[in-house]
């Protein structure tokens, strides 16, 4: 087991043993382009969804959107992230991460879940948090190094985009746009409010057993 790691935000809500490292997250405000529901039909008509089994927070987010918008849930089928197989026997597929850059979109209806969340709440969506296990003593220099690495990465986005674009098979410009303008890397007041709203709705719809407080390293817990 790791003592310090990024975890899906919903994982924090389900585990009372975690503390949050402040001022860092993987978040988005509006369109993100890498958490997508692709469908053969309109969202309100979807009856079955194939969900990438790695996408814990995204699955709960999608369920919240269905409950809030239509007061119902389709049937979720959990599977490996094979886009063609996912859509072959389901009305829609939840696709996340690098797979969203390459799948065929022609003739499909695409819903960006981060944009749908923003339209629903007006708040950012926090996809992942940097967490440490409670009672584990983490050297503050390690956290400072992580935050410094984040800042150095942001200062080097052009080169990172060039390298990653080649790996992903997309243009450097598309990669840079994603890293610069689609992803947010902090955990400020706006992100914390979005996280609280996510947990509140997840709890009210029965997707988590309790609504967690945001407990940070250094707080008196």
Label each PLM-derived region with a short phrase.
Residues 73-79, 169-180, 209-214:
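Short, surface-exposed acidic
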Residues 204-221:
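Long, low-complexity C-terminal extensions of enzymes
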Residues 19, 74-75, 109:
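Conserved beta-strand segments of alpha/beta enzyme cores
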Residues 7, 23, 77-81, 217-219:
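Conserved beta-strand termini and adjacent loop/short-helix elements that scaffold enzyme active sites
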Residues 6, 78-164:
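Pocket-lining segment of extracytoplasmic ligand-binding domains
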Residues 138-201, 205:
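Secondary-structure end/capping motifs
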Residues 32-91, 193, 199:
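Bilobed "Venus flytrap"/periplasmic-binding protein-like clamshell domains
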Residues 1-45, 53-54, 58:
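Short, glycine-/small- and polar/acidic-enriched structural segments
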